Amino acid sequence: MKRILITNDDGFESLGLRALIEALRDIAQLTIVVPANEKSACGHSLTLTKPLRFVEIEDNFYKLEDGTPTDCVYLALSSLYPDGEKPDIIVSGINRGANMGEDITYSGTVAGAMEGAIYDIPSIAISQVCNSNCEETEMEVGYEQAKYVARDLVEKIFQQGWPAGHRRCLNVNVPPTKEFKGYKITRAGYRVYFNQAHLHRNPRGIEYWWLGLHPLDWIPGKERDCDFEAVKEGFVSITPIKADLTAYEEIPKLKSWL
């Protein structure tokens, strides 16, 4: 039987995780290793300054105390699989909220898949895009389309093989609709950012900050092939990504500059 390693960044109690387990539980042997607490926007961070501890919730379902999604995949591959063995696929998600454009560099969900890609394991990050409010999206839309997409893509990989190259993963974003309109293969778009740091003071006058979430806005391109545009049009966006961040097009200019 095929084996799937599941992780996320929303924690072990998230609705998206439960939906993903329901979607995949009868087509593969699942091992679930997720953070004990929400780790949204933790990026590809690996814990090096304190010990980590598995807590088994159910058979093959673990939460990792103080762990990140990267920790979860790293430790699962190190300790839960016999020597030389690997899962057939790693699936990270289903994330509550979008992971598009440059936001993928912040995303713990994407990092979980990227950690798998580093080990050359087929890996997918799946995110449920929200309307203006994620709680309302969960209530009104739910995760039914995301469940369908997760299962469909995993079955395609099992039947047809991995469609991307070595050390690549797929970043999948599902629009906030109930009906499946289809897939679009996309590039990562360019996000619009602005400062959302809010200063507060506690009753003792000590200052502290909350970092706010940016509204989902992007820079329109000449070609309508980015993840933002696909999701806006109601399609599931699939973006192939890799850990290699080299800007190859800049190398000749830098050589001449020196």
Swiss-Prot record:
Coiled coil: none annotated. It is found in: Cytoplasm. GO terms for molecular function: 3'-nucleotidase activity; 5'-nucleotidase activity; exopolyphosphatase activity; metal ion binding; nucleotide binding. It catalyses: a ribonucleoside 5'-phosphate + H2O = a ribonucleoside + phosphate. Its EC number is 3.1.3.5. It is an enzyme of class 3 (hydrolase). It comes from the Bacteria. GO terms for cellular component: cytoplasm. Binds 1 divalent metal cation per subunit. Keywords: Cytoplasm, Hydrolase, Metal-binding, Nucleotide-binding. Gene3D superfamilies: Survival protein SurE-like phosphatase/nucleotidase. Its cofactor is a divalent metal cation. Pfam families: SurE. A divalent metal cation binds at D9, D10, S40, N95. NCBIfam families: PRK00346.1-4, PRK00346.2-4, surE. Nucleotidase that shows phosphatase activity on nucleoside 5'-monophosphates. Belongs to the SurE nucleotidase family. This is 5'-nucleotidase SurE.
